[in-house]
């Protein structure tokens, strides 16, 4: 009797219905995210919330996107800036603590990082008010102050090629009427063989104290690292005695 053979049906591959595990998406940094900073070689630890405390500041802009921030070899966020006065900046961002020491230096850092509330607070302090408000307003009344200051230094350097000291004269021309006689002053200095490099300041419309202007000039030149002292040189009356010109001498010592 014939017996049929059993036919085995092909078995299809088993497919797993269990979904494959997915790698977790990176979390977006939150305001409480702790970050490590390398500020000019000095390390600080803070949070994004602290750095972003004042929208519009340079720090808030730097850390608005961590992908854009520079990092050092250890992964710290790097700020290429001297770190000496960064801690007072960070303390203010953390707690609102206003610095009480090194005010001018911290003020410059606050300006650099564009932290406007801190800048305003520091400008109300005597150390900054006198320099940035009172003195600055005074000098704004002197036309061409910065340019003439630079000219004084250039002339003094030019005369110091073979000399230990060099001098520059400063002539104050207070009014436009007085300015018309300025050439007479130059002729007088030349005739008396006192003619040196002369820089004219003025005319101006405000009422200024000459001694205050001389003090500002000497202070600003010294701030550039030069050794200089000023003194009254002479008063020149015009031939008709209508005006008097005050002339001052600035002496630079080079070695």
UniProtKB/Swiss-Prot annotation:
Cite the SUPFAM superfamilies for this sequence: POZ domain
One biological-process term from Gene Ontology? protein homooligomerization
* Location of the region described as Disordered in the Swiss-Prot/TrEMBL record: 1-29
Please indicate which superkingdom the organism of origin belongs to. Answer: Eukaryota
* Domain (BTB): residue spans on this chain: 33-130
Q: Name one Pfam family in it.
A: BTB_2
- CDD domains associated with the record: BTB_POZ_KCTD14 (cd18371)
According to UniProt, the name of this protein is BTB/POZ domain-containing protein KCTD14
This protein's gene is called KCTD14
């Amino acid at each position: 009797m014939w017996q049929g053979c059993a036919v085995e049906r092909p078995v299809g591959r088993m497919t797993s219905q269990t979904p494959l595990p997915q790698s977790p998406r990176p979390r977006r940094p939150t305001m409480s995210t702790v970050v490590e900073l390398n500020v000019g070689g000095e390390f600080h630890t803070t949070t994004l919330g602290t750095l972003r405390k004042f929208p519009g500041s340079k720090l808030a802009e730097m850390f608005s996107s961590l992908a854009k921030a520079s990092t050092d070899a250890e992964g710290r966020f790097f700020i290429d800036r001297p770190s000496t006065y960064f801690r007072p900046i960070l303390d203010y961002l953390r707690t609102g603590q206003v610095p009480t020491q090194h005010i001018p230096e911290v003020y410059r850092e606050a300006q650099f990082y564009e932290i406007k509330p801190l800048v305003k607070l520091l400008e109300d302090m005597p150390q900054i008010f006198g320099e940035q408000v009172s003195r600055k307003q005074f000098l704004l009344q002197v036309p061409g102050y910065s340019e003439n200051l630079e000219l004084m230094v250039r002339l003094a350097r030019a005369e110091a090629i073979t000399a230990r000291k060099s001098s520059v004269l400063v002539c104050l021309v207070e009014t436009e009427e007085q300015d018309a006689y300025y050439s007479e002053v130059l002729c007088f200095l030349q005739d008396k063989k006192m003619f040196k490099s002369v820089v004219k300041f003025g005319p101006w419309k405000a009422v200024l104290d000459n001694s205050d202007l001389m003090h500002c000039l000497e202070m600003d030149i010294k701030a550039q690292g030069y050794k200089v002292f000023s003194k009254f040189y002479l008063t020149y009356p015009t031939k008709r005695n209508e005006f008097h010109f005050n002339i001052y001498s600035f002496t630079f010592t080079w070695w």
